C-alpha cells in the first residue's frame, strides 16, 4: 500500500472510497514521539486482516486550549511526524486545516459539554472547557472518518475516561482500545510538551517520574503513600503543584479506599511547562468473577478468556461437581450431612495439568474431569451445593487459590460470596431455550443420551429455581455485576465482548495483554 498524506476531507474521502477497508483511527495533535509510535505499532499488531487501514490524524485543536495556553507554540512539524508515523506502521495520515474539521468555524457546529462531575476533576479543574473541546473535536473527527476502532493512550487517563463515557452515552459504534503509558530510560512519560523543557528544567522535572516510581514501590510493599513528602520534594525542585491526589480511576474523585484499584494522579508546572503523570495502585492482581445459570457457556468462555489474558482459571462449578461425584460413587445419601462432612474432611480436591485447554480436576487422586459431566451428577449437584458445610469448605479452598489475584473464576456465587471484592463481575446468562440447545450438543459430544431438548429445558428451569431459591449462597446477579445475555452469540463473540468489558475496567498498565 502506498502511504498517503491528506489535508482535505475530499482527498481523504476519495481515497477511502476506493479502499473498502475498516479504519483503525489514532487521533493526535502532532508533536509525535515514541508514545504515539507505540500506539501505532499496537494497532498494526492487532490487525486481524489486510482489509484494515491505520489512519493517524494530526490536528492541533484550538478548542481544547484556554487563553494564555500553548496553542501557538505547540509542536508542528508535519514532515517529522509523518516519518515517525509511517515508520511505526501507519498506512495514511490526515492533517486537516481548521476549516476542514469545522467548516464555517466552531460556532457553526454543535459543541459537546462534558458532565461537570467528570470535567471538574484533575486537569479539568484548572483547564476550564478543555475536555468540552476534546469531546467536541473527537465527535467531529469520528463523523468524518467513520472508523471501526479508536486507539488511545492511557497517559491522558481523564481524557480516555471521558471519551469512553461519551461513546457509551451516545451509542457510538466504535470500539475503543487503550494502551499503557510509555516512558523513556529516565522514567519520563513521553509527551509532546517535554520538548519545551530546558536542560535545567529537565533536571528539576525528573523528580516527577521519580516520585511516581517510588510511590508505586512503597505501595506495593504495603506502605502508605506520603503525599506531603512528595509535595515537599516537588517544592525543593521548583515544581508548582496543580494537583497531587489519590483518586478513584473512574469517578476521578479523591478516595481513601485503597483496597480497590486507585490512581495516584499528579500535575505540576516546571517553569511554564505543564506536566502530568500517574500510576495505578493495586494491592493484588485483578480478580474477575463470572457468574450465571447452568448452560450459559460460562466454562467455555471463561477458559478462553483466561487463556487470552493470562489469568489462572478457576472452575468452581467443577469443584461442586467433583464433590457430588464423590458422594454418588460412595453411595452416600445426599441428605446425610454427617456422612458428607465425614467424607469431605479427608478428601483431597485439586486441579492438575492446568493448561487452559486440558485443565483436569482430581478428587482423592482420581481424575474425574469427564465423570463429573454425567447426567447423574448434573441432576444432583444443586442438592449438594446448597449444603452449608459443603459451601464453606469449597469457598475457603477457592479463596485460598485466589489470595494473590491474577484469577478468573466462574460459578453461581463468585461475585456475591466467594470474591465479593472482585475487580470485575460479569453475570453471563442466556434463555432456557438457548441453554437447552447447548446442553444437548454437549451431551451428544460426550456420548450421553437424553430424551428431548424440551425435557432438557424443563430440567434447566428446575435447576434455576433450585439455585435461585436456596437459602445459602443462592444464584443471583451481584449488585455491581454487568449482565451479558449470550443468545445468538458464538464463543468468539462472547469472548470479544468480555475482553472489551474487562479493558473498560482494568487498564493495560495494571494487567498487560500477553503477547500471542
Curated annotation (Swiss-Prot):
Catalytic activity of the protein: (R)-pantoate + beta-alanine + ATP = (R)-pantothenate + AMP + diphosphate + H(+); CMP + ATP = CDP + ADP; dCMP + ATP = dCDP + ADP
Any Pfam family: Pantoate_ligase
Family per similarity comment: In the N-terminal section; belongs to the pantothenate synthetase family. In the C-terminal section; belongs to the cytidylate kinase family. Type 1 subfamily.
Name of the protein described by the UniProt record: Bifunctional pantoate ligase/cytidylate kinase
CDD domains cross-referenced by the UniProt entry: CMPK
Active site, renumbered: 36
HAMAP family named in the record: Cytidyl_kinase_type1 (MF_00238), PanC (MF_00158), PanCY (MF_01349)
Positions with a binding annotation for beta-alanine: 64
NCBIfam families associated with the record: cmk (TIGR00017), panC (TIGR00018), PRK13477.1 (NF010004)
Known pathway: Cofactor biosynthesis; (R)-pantothenate biosynthesis; (R)-pantothenate from (R)-pantoate and beta-alanine: step 1/1
Binding site for ATP: 29-36, 153-156, 190-193
Record's subcellular location: Cytoplasm
PANTHER family per record: CYTIDYLATE KINASE, CYTIDYLATE KINASE/PANTOATE-BETA-ALANINE LIGASE
Natural source organism: Prochlorococcus marinus (strain NATL2A)
Signal peptide: none
Any one GO cellular component localisation term in the record: cytosol
Positions bound to (R)-pantoate: 64, 159
A biological process from GO: pantothenate biosynthetic process
EC identifiers of the protein: 6.3.2.1, 2.7.4.25
Sequence segments annotated as region (Pantoate--beta-alanine ligase): 1-279
Cytidylate kinase: region residues: 280-516
Listed InterPro entries: Cytidylate_kin, Cytidylate_kinase_dom, P-loop_NTPase, Pantoate_ligase, Pantoate_ligase/cytidylate_kin, Pantoate_ligase_C, Rossmann-like_a/b/a_fold
Primary subcellular site in the record, as a coarse category: cytoplasm
GO molecular function: ATP binding; CMP kinase activity; dCMP kinase activity; pantoate-beta-alanine ligase activity
Source domain of life: Bacteria
Keywords for the protein's UniProt record, in alphabetical order: ATP-binding, Cytoplasm, Kinase, Ligase, Multifunctional enzyme, Nucleotide-binding, Pantothenate biosynthesis, Transferase
Function per UniProt: Catalyzes the condensation of pantoate with beta-alanine in an ATP-dependent reaction via a pantoyl-adenylate intermediate. Catalyzes the transfer of a phosphate group from ATP to either CMP or dCMP to form CDP or dCDP and ADP, respectively.
